[in-house]
């Protein structure tokens, strides 16, 4: 299986927006090359996580090796790297692109170019990829291939005159894709006699084999029994197994330059394998590591707490297991007066947060409370100290803060021009600054700078609802800027509830505070005494709601008689309530927490 020379190897990835048919095209390529029999085929073969199939998205990058006999009679090895399309998994995309020389750009012929397609194409262009445009779903009545070709040329600047016309669902034209891979993509370069250099593309944990590493060999040969070294940590291991995915794991003797495959070397934890690291031979190490890719930095943080306090250790183990398969996910232990012991977790974005939460509840059967997502702020104190703030509850008093900087993003929004007005209004409500606005046919492309804090709550949902689902959105980080930000504390019966505090711009603080107080008033059960629910900035109260007391009719047992008897009982009740208000503790039920934290901002 490994005797295919390097000039007949093609490494490629598929770039597409969500739902443009990327995983379906991968299925057809696997079927046409006979990698799996018809009996073994399932839809979305490479999306092997139940969650991926259910949501129709690709989360983890997957690889598969296909052998294809081309029209010139020669057998080629095609290594397909299936990449995610969603903005939160851009890190997975950058890894996949670093391992390939070319890309198929799949665009839905009825919908045209979307924002996430753009972001990934620019990454591929930066990685010097040869890009082959493919128009999918040309069999649909709504398909407009000529308009979409023009759009590819105008928006991306790629020549689309020889774009391939296919329907991945029916299999129409998929054979032309295989031929194009052979004729239009370059072969990898590499020297089999040089020092071993292999790029660590991904790693995941297998319960039986330990850590499995996905590699792309650049130079040298990787073989079973070899002693290898990780160049970033200096750790050494002996290779137990070398193989390729076709798409099942298939052991081979060696991996040669230009090939992609996996190795298993009895590594205990994925923390020992840094994605983007260079693997070399321990006896004859390479002098220089390969250019890796940028490590991922979490941009959204939130607290995760078990509803049942006994599940804390189980949550720690579960987070550790997810971290094994997801290098971009961070967590550290923290405690909250209201919620007990839990973890502060860092994510690449909101979809990433949602996926991790869902995996915790499905795969590990955990019931969790998540605090409101927040971003990382940079604090400059008056004594010259600089802090990074992940948790709003840790924000110091305003008197010692010189300035606060918040992260901004540069967002690209593609939308049919009928909905442009609503989108522009939404962006300006969220303190957006317009950078660019261009028209391509009947679609507009708006580029905005927005504070990330305004995007993490419900911006994506609002964007979809004001554009009836037609807008697509993509962003990249765009530095930090000083801003007038305040911490809003929520007080229940004059006690601060740390889990509900949040940071907002001063202009929106009062409104947000009022909303959360009103929501809590509905959710907290009434007590025997009055409860004040307040929102405060420092010591200044900006919003208040009062939850009325339950009243017990203490005079019910008095039939007739003197009024002073009734008055005495009422006075006694009043005294008791006053004392209760002073010493009474208000238990906020978990359902109230969940609802308040889920509240649309």
From Swiss-Prot:
A Pfam family annotated for this UniProt entry: GTP_EFTU
Example of a GO MF term: GTP binding
UniProt keyword terms in alphabetical order: Cell inner membrane, Cell membrane, GTP-binding, Hydrolase, Membrane, Nucleotide-binding, Protein biosynthesis
Main localization, broad class: membrane
Record has GTP-binding as a keyword: yes
InterPro entries, alphabetized: EF-4, EFG_III/V, EFG_V-like, EFTu-like_2, G_TR_CS, LepA_C_sf, LepA_CTD, LepA_IV
Enzyme class: hydrolase
Role, per record: Required for accurate and efficient protein synthesis under certain stress conditions. May act as a fidelity factor of the translation reaction, by catalyzing a one-codon backward translocation of tRNAs on improperly translocated ribosomes. Back-translocation proceeds from a post-translocation (POST) complex to a pre-translocation (PRE) complex, thus giving elongation factor G a second chance to translocate the tRNAs correctly. Binds to ribosomes in a GTP-dependent manner.
Protein name in UniProt: Elongation factor 4
């Amino acid at each position: 299986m490994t005797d295919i020379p390097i000039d007949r190897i093609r490494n490629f990835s598929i770039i597409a927006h969500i739902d443009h048919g990327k995983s379906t095209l991968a299925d057809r390529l696997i079927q046409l090359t006979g990698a799996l029999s018809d009996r073994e085929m399932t839809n979305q073969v490479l999306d092997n996580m139940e969650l991926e199939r259910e949501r129709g998205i690709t989360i983890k990058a997957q690889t598969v090796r296909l052998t294809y006999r081309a029209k010139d009679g020669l057998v080629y090895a095609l290594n397909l790297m299936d990449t995610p399309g969603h903005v939160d998994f851009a890190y997975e995309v950058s890894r996949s692109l670093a391992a390939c020389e070319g890309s198929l750009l799949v665009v839905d012929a009825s919908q045209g170019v979307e924002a996430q397609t753009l972001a990934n194409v620019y990454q591929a262009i930066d990685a010097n990829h040869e890009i082959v445009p493919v128009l999918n779903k040309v069999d649909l009545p709504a398909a407009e291939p000529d308009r979409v070709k023009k759009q590819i040329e105008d928006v991306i600047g790629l020549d689309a005159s020889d774009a391939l016309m296919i329907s991945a669902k029916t299999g129409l034209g998929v054979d032309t894709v295989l031929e194009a891979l052979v004729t239009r993509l370059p072969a990898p370069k590499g020297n089999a006699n040089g020092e071993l250099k292999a790029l660590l593309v991904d790693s995941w944990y297998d319960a039986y084999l330990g850590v499995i590493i996905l590699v792309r060999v650049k130079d040298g040969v990787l073989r079973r029994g070899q002693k290898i070294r990780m160049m970033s940590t200096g750790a050494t291991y002996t290779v137990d197994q070398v193989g390729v995915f076709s798409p099942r794991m298939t052991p081979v003797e060696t991996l040669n330059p230009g090939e992609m495959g996996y190795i298993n070397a009895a590594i205990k934890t994925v923390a020992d394998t840094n994605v983007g690291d260079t693997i070399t031979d321990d006896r004859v190490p390479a002098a220089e590591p390969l250019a890796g890719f940028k490590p991922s930095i979490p941009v959204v943080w939130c607290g995760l707490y078990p509803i049942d306090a006994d599940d804390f250790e189980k949550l720690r183990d579960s987070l550790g297991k997810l971290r094994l398969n997801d290098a971009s996910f961070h967590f550290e232990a923290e405690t909250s007066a209201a919620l007990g012991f839990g973890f502060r977790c860092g994510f690449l974005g909101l979809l990433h947060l949602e996926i991790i939460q869902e995996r915790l509840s499905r795969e590990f059967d955990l019931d969790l409370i998540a605090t409101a997502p927040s971003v990382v702020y940079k604090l400059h104190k008056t004594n010259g100290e600089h802090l990074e703030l992940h948790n709003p509850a840790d924000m110091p008093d305003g008197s010692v803060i010189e300035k606060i900087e918040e992260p901004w993003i540069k967002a690209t929004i593609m939308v049919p021009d009928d909905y442009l007005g609503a989108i522009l209004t939404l962006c300006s409500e969220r303190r957006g600054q317009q950078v660019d606005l261009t028209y391509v046919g009947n679609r507009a492309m708006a580029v905005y700078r927005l504070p990330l804090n305004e995007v993490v709550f419900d911006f994506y949902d609002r964007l979809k609802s004001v554009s009836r689902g037609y807008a697509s959105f993509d962003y990249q980080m765009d530095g930090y800027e000083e801003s007038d930000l305040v911490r809003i504390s929520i007080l229940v019966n004059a006690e601060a509830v740390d889990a509900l505090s949040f940071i907002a711009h001063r202009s929106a603080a009062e409104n947000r505070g009022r909303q959360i107080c009103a929501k809590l008033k509905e959710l907290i059960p009434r007590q025997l005494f009055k409860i004040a629910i307040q929102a405060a900035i420092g010591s200044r109260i900006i919003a208040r709601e009062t939850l009325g007391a339950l009243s017990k009719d203490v005079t019910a047992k008095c039939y007739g008689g003197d009024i002073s008897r009734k008055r005495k009982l009422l006075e006694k009740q009043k005294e008791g309530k006053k004392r209760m208000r002073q010493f009474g503790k208000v238990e906020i039920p978990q359902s109230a927490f969940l609802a308040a934290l889920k509240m649309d901002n």
